[in-house]
Regions:
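AMP-binding/adenylate-forming core of the ANL superfamily
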Residues: 125-147, 151-153, 159, 213
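AMP-binding/adenylate-forming
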Residues: 1-52
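AMP-binding/adenylate-forming catalytic core of the ANL superfamily
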Residues: 151-233
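Active-site glycine-centered loops adjacent to acidic/histidine catalytic or metal-binding residues
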Residues: 46, 73, 96, 150, ...
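Gly/Ser/Thr-rich phosphate-binding loop
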Residues: 56-111
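Conserved acidic residues
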Residues: 41-42, 67, 150
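Conserved C-terminal "lid"/linker of ANL adenylate-forming enzymes
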Residues: 197, 209-211, 224-264
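Structural motif
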Residues: 42-44, 70, 211
Length: 264
């Protein structure tokens, strides 16, 4: 159910060939379990597909009975993570990119082993750059170290968590604001999808802008922002849109969001 032009889709095929699994082809869509009669042993999905499947009882039943479910291609917000905590089988969030041939680390989302920290594979080494971005050494897939744009934290056990992306930092009046941290905070209190982006401003240099689907109540969103966010994180503008911009793999399309905020 992943597009084959992306590494995530290609690696599903590779895994099935290496493990001798029966590959069940499903056209990439928002409801990959819709036509299935029984749960697969293994599945790889993006958060949007998992979220959609949870809204349909028949699909949710199948989702719960996938023995090994990996979720990648985007952040898993608090509400989605909470819905997966009680799943009976193995549910994982993955971390990786095209350059690493899919994921190089996993974190468990359910059961006693659930964690906020990613565990790198045995042959993968990680460290932080001077800018606190994650550096990956995965010699089996890449001869040289790979410096990412992901701002990370590494604990004493060698596990890591992602705080945001270097290129997703808003500099507003000299205060650096990480887009993902604002979104994560709001998702704990809002059940509706939103996106945070930036727009140029003569006074502050950049301002925080919140995009939301136009059918939602702006007053409710604004009230949550004013109550739950620090003053310098609070959006200066709220923009209703027909649809929040997403990439082909279901990630927030940050470039398009910025263009919308700039009125382009």
């Amino acid at each position: 159910c992943m597009p084959l032009q992306y590494i995530a889709g290609k690696m599903v095929v590779v895994r099935s060939l290496i493990a001798g699994l029966k590959l069940i082809p499903v056209a990439p869509c928002g409801h990959p379990l819709k036509e299935l009669k029984e749960a697969p042993t293994f599945a790889a999905m993006i958060p949007m597909q998992v979220y959609n499947s949870l809204q349909v009882p028949e699909e949710k039943h199948l989702l719960k009975h996938i023995k090994h479910l990996i979720i990648g291609g985007g952040a898993i917000d608090t509400s989605l993570g909470n819905e997966l905590k009680d799943f009976p089988n193995h549910v994982w969030s993955t971390y990786g990119m095209t350059e690493t041939l899919s994921h190089i680390a996993l974190r468990r989302l359910n059961g006693k082993e659930a964690s906020d920290w990613y565990t790198p594979f045995e042959n993968v080494r990680i460290r932080l750059s001077e800018e606190n971005t994650l550096i990956i050494h995965a010699p089996n897939v890449c001869a040289e170290e790979l410096t990412t744009n992901d701002i990370a934290e590494i604990n004493e056990e060698g596990k890591f968590r992602i705080l945001g992306r270097k290129d997703n930092t808003i500099n507003s009046g000299g205060v650096k604001i990480q887009i993902e941290q604002v979104e994560t905070t709001l998702r704990k209190h809002l059940s509706i999808p939103i996106q945070i982006t930036a727009a140029p401003d003569a006074k502050f240099g950049e301002i925080v802008v919140l995009l939301y689907n136009k059918v939602e109540d702006e007053k409710e969103i604004k009230a949550v922002c004013e109550e739950k966010l620090p003053p310098y994180w609070q959006p200066k503008r709220y923009l209703p849109v027909e649809q929040l911009p997403l990439t082909g793999t279901g990630k927030p399309d940050r470039a398009t969001a910025r263009r919308i905020a700039r009125g382009e």
